Amino acid sequence: MTDQWHGSVSFASVDCRINFSGKMIADLPKYTNAVSPERRFVALENRFTSLSECTTLSDPFVDACMKHDKALRGRVKLLGQLLGEVISSQAGDDVLRTVERLRKGFIQLRDRPDPVRLERLKKVIGTLSPDALRPVIRAFSIYFQLAGTAEESFKHRQRRRIAARGGVLWKGSFDACLRDLREMGVAPDELQDLLEEIRYMPVFTAHPTESKRRSIMLQMRRIFESNDALDAPPIFVDHTEIYTRNLHTHIQTLWKTDEVRPSRPDVRHEIRMGMHHFKGALFDAIPVVYGRLERAIHRAYDDHPDFQGVDLPAMLRFGSWIGGDRDGNPNVTADTTREAILTQHLTILRAYIERVADLVGILTHSQDFCSPSPAFLGSLREDDAYRERFDQEWPARFPEEPYRRKLYVMGLRLRQAERRGLAWLDGRPWNPEIIGYRGEDEFLHDLVLIRDSMISHGDADAANAELLDLIRLTRTFGFYLARLDIRQESTVHSDAVADVLARLGIEQNYASLDETRRLELLGELIEKPPVIDDRGALAAMTQEVLRVLDVVGEMQHAISPRVIGRYVISMAHRASDVLHVMFLASLTGLCGQQGKVFRCRLGVSPLFETIDDLARIEPVISELLDHAVYQRLLRAHGSIQEVMLGYSDSAKDGGIVASAWLLYRAQQRVITLGKQRGVRIRLFHGRGGTIGRGGGPTHDAIRAQPAGTLLGQIKFTEQGEVLSYKYSNRETAIYELTMGLTGVISASTGLIRDVEADDETYHSNMRLLAKKGEAAYRRLTEQTPGFLDYFYEATPVSEIGLLNIGSRPSHRARGDRSKSSVRAIAWVFGWAQARQTLPAWYGLGTALEGCCSNKQRLKTLRRMYRDWPFFRALLDNTQMALVKSRMDIAGEYAELCSDEQIRETVFGLIEEEYRRTEKWIRKVARIDELLDENPLLKTSLRRRDPYLDPLNHIQLELLQRYRNPETRDVDREASLDPLLRSINAIAGGMRNTG
């Protein structure tokens, strides 16, 4: 190759780039911004728990990454060289030369802004046809994926190196967490009590922010494995050559794999996609997480005089919205919900079948050399009683090896359960006499029986290896894999209730009733539900709501009573929104009164997601918990009231400052209400991946929750692309789950210790900040003429809707371009692509400036940043969002707005607030540059960002072509494909969509 493609590297202690031929070249310039000389650099927003977030100067992980950065640079060099070879051989040297020209040119612009050079580069882009632009975009896109994989593998190696040498581990590790608990004086019995209360519950969603296809994820997994193998000690002479060749092969296959979906995924595709992370990483990761926690406990407490071991409960639980979330998605029906549950059921059964088969080959104990427990021997006799109904051959299998014999039967019973699930899925009849496991409790009983028996005759080591791993998997996943939440919008339920009551002649004008009368009537009807003789007479949507509840009951009976998580009511405004669902559930037998006893098999979670709703959450929850009938239903369902908080829509509604503060206060208020009424409140956090949608570092975000509100449990959504970043690789999944668990454990010590209340001065300052921030945000988004026209013209939000990345529409109402109609995901996605990440910071600068006019208040804000985790997380997360913005590039997107006055007004306000926010955050945090306190992330993002510049300018050119009314239809259609690829590429480069 005559030209070499250069790659940026992350986590370097010095600022340098690599020529992929191996030569070190000049330092990267300090980041400059043609619009603002104050900007020193630009970076991209961090993910909700990306690995580079564990960064403090004293952290061993940071030290290791800085010390061994040369290895990372070398690996990125190798991957870049291999990619260059693939581009040259598969696309031609002309493509490679174009990529190199753009790369070099835009890096030079970072060093010395030059309008003439910029126009020259734009002209180069403008002369390229859609067919010529496509491979250029793909080259940069694949580079980002390879560099990200190299970073991920590198960080895994550094953690492995730290663990191998012993001593202090990194922030968020089990060892660090247990050491802190021991130093707090937490006794072994207190530790056991604390762990019993811990529940860490990620909920996987199919929100359309995952722009990466499953086939791409699988290819990247192969690249990760080959890259990791390359670092293993060589066991044969040509070790390096073989794995380098493997990498080349996988990269070439990746080049030949289309990263853009040919069609929009349907819900069935999303259901199958949701299984990928369980099968690919989580089934293997979870036993490792529990094993590491157990060993860390022993290291911390073995010398404690009262320590006699610990019994680890099942602290990890998983949920899902995939196939259950029908809010705004007409493609999710009762049938797809049923299919989602059965698909999850079959997925986990097959995982158990595989692992039981493995145990058959592991637990080969002979009855001549061990004495199984009487209970275990009794279970073998029970198995023999099934002989005529099951398998004539089984008594002949392993007659002298009792555990293999038992496991063989268990495998048969699992396969029978699998066949039963397939029959349900296909709508075929099934013989109930076939003896398959009827639920997870039966299967778990047999596993524990084997373990107890083995321990009884001195085989504890073998009992606590692969067998214990399977027990822990079963306690985590049951027979359902992930508890499926059902979600629907509140007016669907109120309309359904009105329809039912009118059809039955109970109330002809339900909508006119006030809240008091509604609650009274609903309570009476739940106690004595009416009978619907003819559902066919009801409205179509009412019938569908009832069918969904029928499926809930059917699947609870068929698979597990735990198969459903909660029924989430979006846009909940009042207590009757919850009672509507309970009344409809009573019509299908899910709740009601039998004699004097109430029963309830469905928990409801109201979702508060606007600024007004968050402000009114206290009276709504209070009225709900005080409702006599609902109190009895709640007690029948375990006395746990889940309340969901919407980060995305509240931030879109009133801005990041008001949203963050109202969410914080809402948590405190509902927890207090629960304590007053003897009801446990579990908070469900509806967070997105970006800062503007509630994202941020997991461990720090958990610890930043209001003191005393976590109560051992946290449930939160894991949306879109976050899933692939966190759970595509086993090694990363282990890290992410560890960080989450330690965050919950550390933040839940209020269960065993008194917690210190917040300083009231901090609250008064936050009230002022929230008020000023919301006012500034609403002035821009609701009171500035033409703002929404600017949004739709100066961002690619309309074109994002053409990208096949999700089954749900990007707007709540077709053709409605209002702020309330556009979904929070599309709102954030559009601004991010145009490098104007205002949802994550707009209004904060004005708020800080208004408060800091008082010097004493500035001192208080600095103390808040130093001592209050909530405020520190708010400002740190905002820094990550700010450094992702590029006001010079944002200004070029602004030129897409056709109205000059609107363009100048709106962009002027955005740019001014950006400068203001950057200035005041630096003052409050007392830093010279943003992210000064996170040097690894700062360096990593500084290196990645120059490679986004060409992509943004390519996208700008394609947007102009695609939107130009004079462009012929055939040319417009030709521009669409590379335009969609540019959206994918920028999302990958920024590691962020919505």
What label would you give each PLM region?
Residues F48-G523, M541, L602, G695, ...:
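Often metal-dependent polyanion-binding catalytic scaffolds in large enzymes
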Residues A747, D754-G994:
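Long, compositionally biased intrinsically disordered regions
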Residues R213-E225, H239-D258, G436, L467, ...:
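Structured alpha-helical segments in the cores of large, soluble enzyme domains
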Residues V332-T364, T588-A775:
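Catalytic or ion-translocation cores adjacent to nucleophile or general acid/base/metal-coordination motifs
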Residues D3, D15, N19, D27, ...:
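Intrinsic-disorder-associated, low-complexity terminal segments enriched in Asp/Asn/His/Tyr and depleted
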Residues P313-M315, G319-W321, N329, I471-R472, ...:
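Beta-sheet entry/capping signal
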Residues L412, Q416, A423, A482-L484, ...:
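Active-site cores of enzymes that catalyze phosphoryl transfer or operate on phosphate-rich substrates
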